[in-house]
UniProtKB/Swiss-Prot annotation:
Positions of the PpiC domain: 174-276, 289-388
Source lineage: Bacteria, Pseudomonadati, Pseudomonadota, Gammaproteobacteria, Lysobacterales
Name the record gives this protein: Chaperone SurA
Keyword Nucleotide-binding attached: no
Record-listed E.C. numbers: 5.2.1.8
Residues passing through the membrane, by range: none
GO biological process, one term: Gram-negative-bacterium-type cell outer membrane assembly
Length: 463
């Protein structure tokens, strides 16, 4: 059985502002029209309006950190365009989300918001968002996540040498750094004029920050071309192995509150702020975990097998095993998990959370040799037989795994952002709203909405 890639459904609500079920919205909807044509898809004005309202609701009480409405609308529209392009690319790659998967995702979102699916429907209706539109938005976000996963699996690798180097760095400095950044984007193959314009803009933004006319998060919201601009450019806590080598030494020498840059990177000019730093927990302590050895049999649900058919099949298989049939032989004959079927369903040794919480709970609750009742996961219907358990020191193994994951995450962020730039640069985009309205296809401009720095805001925002 392949280990499921963790898709935290709560994070779907933060990827784009279009699907937040708890954001305020006007109940009356204007007559819908097209805001932008994106290849063979469109962004509707209602989508754009709803997304802008949701961003504003997230900044309630901090409205002075938002850019003017026309700039905010352009930023949000560009984000929606990127979502449309990713969904289109995923569709061309055969990435799909079934209705059943979508239903489970929405049920999880409802649960995380302390309600039922029916309650979520009512909340959406009160907020002026149709349930069909909400389903479409959630489907798009799952598709985007799967495209990103596919990209990572095909293009991102981390060598043992990279892990060794990072561990050496960690031994020298175990510090963690809370970072924020502002990106003034440049297109690939930027001309001298584009570079000069970008340099002028980033210098102007830095001046506003240095003079205290804008704090860093507000400047990021107003001027950054990064996908996390609307989050104030916050990059979260990172260790040195999660930071590009070109910036790692610089950040190590900074003090909290300092802003570095402008720095020229592959995507454009950057300003970096060290928000906070802290020492990581000292290593050396053993970490003991319980590992389990188990076998399983999987019956999938899909186009060729309904939920009821799959459940009936797994019930029959379990009855045979309880009646005396050998589990391994039955797994080789009947399991639909191609990865473990040849080994009689053997999954080897693994911690309880390796295959997801539902699977782990079943294994933890069994005695050695016992066979579970049929249970459902995203993969389908299972039965599992626990073979044994043991205590294992995984401190060193975990440390290497964590370092490998952080390096991979950093590489993915860099490469996927470049991929999005390429995707945007190749796209047919025609704006039909605001001061960018046109009737012709446009090549992607530099991601920045403004060619030069606008005038500073009239009032200094609250820090």
């Amino acid at each position: 059985m392949t280990k499921p890639f963790s898709v935290v459904l709560a994070s779907l609500l933060a990827i784009t502002s279009t699907i937040s079920p708890l954001a305020s919205a006007q109940q009356s909807q204007p007559l819908d029209r097209i805001a932008a044509i994106v290849d063979e898809d469109v962004v509707l004005q209602s989508e754009l309006d709803r997304a802008v309202r949701n961003v504003k609701s997230q900044y309630a009480g901090r409205e002075n950190q938002l850019p003017p409405d026309d700039v905010l609308q352009r930023q949000v529209l560009e984000r929606l365009i990127l979502v449309k392009l990713q969904v289109g690319r995923a569709d061309g790659s055969g990435i799909r989300v079934s209705d059943e998967e979508l239903n489970r995702a929405i049920a999880s979102i409802a649960q995380q918001n302390g309600t039922t699916v029916d309650g979520l429907r009512q909340k959406l209706a009160a907020d002026g968002m149709g349930y069909a539109d909400f389903r479409a938005s959630v489907r798009d976000e799952i598709i985007v996540q799967r495209l990103r996963q596919s990209f990572a699996q095909s293009r991102i690798s981390v060598s043992e040498g990279e892990v060794d180097t990072a561990l050496t760095q960690q031994a020298a400095t175990g510090s963690k750094y809370h970072l924020a950044h502002i990106l003034i984007g440049l297109p690939e193959g930027a001309t001298a004029e584009q570079i000069a314009t970008g340099q002028k803009k980033v210098d102007g933004v830095k001046t506003l920050i240095d003079k205290g006319e804008l704090d860093f998060p507000a400047a990021a919201v107003r001027y950054s071309d990064s996908p996390n601009a609307l989050e104030g450019g916050d990059l979260g806590w990172r260790s040195l192995d999660e930071i590009p080598n070109a910036f790692a030494q610089l950040i190590r020498d900074m003090k909290p509150g300092q802003v570095a840059g402008p720095l020229r990177g592959p995507s454009g000019f950057q300003l970096l702020k060290l928000m906070e730093m802290r020492d990581a927990n000292a290593g050396g302590e053993k970490k003991m975990v319980t590992e389990y050895n188990a076998r399983h049999i999987l019956v999938r649900v899909g186009d060729n097998q309904t939920e009821a058919q799959a459940k009936a099949k797994i019930d029959t298989i379990r009855a045979r095993i309880v009646g005396g049939a050998d589990f391994q032989a039955t797994a080789k004959e009947s399991s639909e998990d191609t990865n473990s079927r040849g080994q009689g369903g053997d999954l080897g040794w693994f911690p309880a959370d390796a295959f997801g919480p539902d699977f782990g709970k079943q294994v933890e609750g069994l005695a050695d040799g016992a066979v579970s009742e049929p249970f459902r996961t995203q993969a389908g219907w299972h039965i599992v037989q626990r073979v044994g358990s043991r205590q294992t020191d995984v401190s060193a193994e975990n440390q290497r795994a964590q370092v490998r994951e952080t390096i991979g995450r950093r590489k993915l962020e860099e490469e996927y952002n470049r991929y999005l730039q390429e995707l945007r640069g190749e796209a047919y985009v025609s704006y039909r709203t605001g001061d960018r309205a046109d009737n012709n296809a446009t090549a992607a401009p530099a991601k920045s909405a403004d060619p030069a720095l606008p005038a500073p805001p009239p009032a200094k925002p609250t820090r």
